[in-house]
Structures are given as C-alpha cells and as structure tokens.
Amino acid sequence: MSAAEAGGVFHRARGRTLDAFPAEKESEWKGPFYFILGADPQFGLMKAWSTGDCDNGGDEWEQEIRLTEQAVQAINKLNPKPKFFVLCGDLIHAMPGKPWRTEQTEDLKRVLRTVDRAIPLVLVSGNHDIGNAPTAETVDEFCRTWGDDYFSFWVGGVLFLVLNSQFYENPSKCPSLKQAQDQWLDEQLSIARQRHCQHAIIFQHIPLFLESIDEDDDYYFNLSKSTRKKLADKFIHAGVKVVFSGHYHRNAGGTYQNLDMVVSSAIGCQLGRDPHGLRVVVVTAEKIVHRYYSLDELSEKGIEDDLMDLIKKK
C-alpha cells in the first residue's frame, strides 16, 4: 500500500502545500495550539550503529518499530489532540539503492498508519531518505513515497515552512532542484513579511548550527558557516522565530539574534545521553514554548500542567 492509498493520516504534501490545512481556513490567529515533533525514527540504525557498520548494516529494526509504536501510542492518548505530528527527517536508515530500504519503508508506513486520523502527519526529508548527495531520481522517489520534499502550510495564522536541507548540504547532483527551492523559499519568506503572520516556523532535517552560529563546520551535523549565516539572516529578516531540526540524535540548540535553533533528539538511535523521545511545542500569541519528553514520560504522564495551561489559555 502506498502512502496515498493509506489515506487518513497520510495527507501527503502536494503542490507545495498540505491539504490537511486549507489556507483559507487557517490564515487567521485563533488561539493557542500545540504540535508534536519527532525526529530520526531511522529504522535500521540501531543495529548498524551497534555493529559499527553504518554504511552497510541495518538488517534489523525491531527496536525502532517498538519505539515508534510507543511514540504513536503516546501521541494518540493526548487530550486535546495536537494539531499535527511532524517527523524531522531520516524516516529510515537504508539510503537510496541500499538493501532493506523497501522493507524499512513499508514497516514505517504500517506504524504511521496507526496515528489517530485526526492528527495529520508532516514529513520532512533527511539525508538517509534522499541520499547525502540527492539526485532528481532520489528526490522523486521521496515525493512519490512520502509527499513533497519542501512545502508550506498555515495553522491558525502561523506559517510553517518545510525545507529540504540536503540541498544546502550537497546539491552537486541536482543544482536545478536546489535553485527551485531557493526561489520558492524567497517567495514564502516574502509572504511571511507581507502578511505579518503570528509566527513563522521552519522544519528541516540538518540544523543550521548545533550551539552557535559561529561554530566550526562539522561537515556532517551542521550546515557550513557561509550557508547557515546566509539562511539565518534571511529567516530573521522575514520574522521567522524558530527552526526545528533533527539529524544530531541528541538535544542541542542555540540562539542567533532573535532566531532560535532547536535540535531535537531521536525517536530511534541515541548518539548521546538523551532518552528516546518527542518534543511538545506550544504556540501562543506571544511565544513558542517547547519541551522534550522521553517516550516513557509522555506515555505515562502526558503533558505537564504548565504547558496545558498555555494550550487552554484563551
């Protein structure tokens, strides 16, 4: 079954937008809401990491299935329901053309089909989803499987932009696709400026930076200095408040001028000391408040009262 046939939860992005949120109904502020952010379920990485062969390993992913099922069950129990559930890339571990890619994809679809149908999915492309050096073919495969690789949508007067960050990391095999996203992004940021939206929020897989705009190039976990600065300045000029990313498999982040960079750890394999988890993000008229929960915490206790008070505030 393809994502399109799965229906319900798979409101796949098409035409650079998400039909789960019609713009004409969602362009005005209606009051506080929240969403759930996850990153890097990356079916197969835990086995590959444990064997020390991240390039060719990953022939088992039962642990990731259980963790993602736990994440979905925790989300489904939440009341009130989140506006959406966003996955910030690296949905699976097997790169394009590698063994087990089809099987990992089908298993993830099966788990995601159990998300409450009232909670749309927002899917972000990661480097493992489209390759470290994406091509027109790998991007097309992602789009056919999961929906557009970049798009925008409105929720209650807030503009959300989903970006394909691999175009900023290595566009050498698809320069025209990168150019198209650049042009589209400029148009979207112009809309954000002109419309004076309540907030503008960006989702992308690779962080601009892990702690500081001036940190050294990591050559893997952050974008290059010149790229990150150019993007961050663009975002700030348009009034973007926060960029959410995954990729690092640890919690991290920092602030540049008035732009927050939030790096959220993984549902799947942890590369640091954080627990497997999800981030609760509350959007109020004045601010964006977020907190990382372990899957166990969210499953057993739900969202804490101080955040619930913000969500219910009129």
Swiss-Prot record:
Keywords: Cytoplasm, Hydrolase, Metal-binding, Phosphoprotein
Top-rank lineage group of the source organism: Eukaryota
Enzyme class: hydrolase
Subcellular location: Cytoplasm
Region feature (Catalytic): 47-250
Enzyme Commission designation: 3.1.3.16
Residues noted as binding a divalent metal cation 2 in the record, renumbered to the chain: 90, 127, 247
Gene Ontology MF terms in the entry: metal ion binding; protein serine/threonine phosphatase activity
Binding site for a divalent metal cation 1: 53, 90
This protein's GO CC annotations: cytoplasm
Family under the similarity heading: Belongs to the metallophosphoesterase superfamily. CPPED1 family.
Protein name as catalogued: Serine/threonine-protein phosphatase CPPED1
Organism: Pongo abelii (Sumatran orangutan)
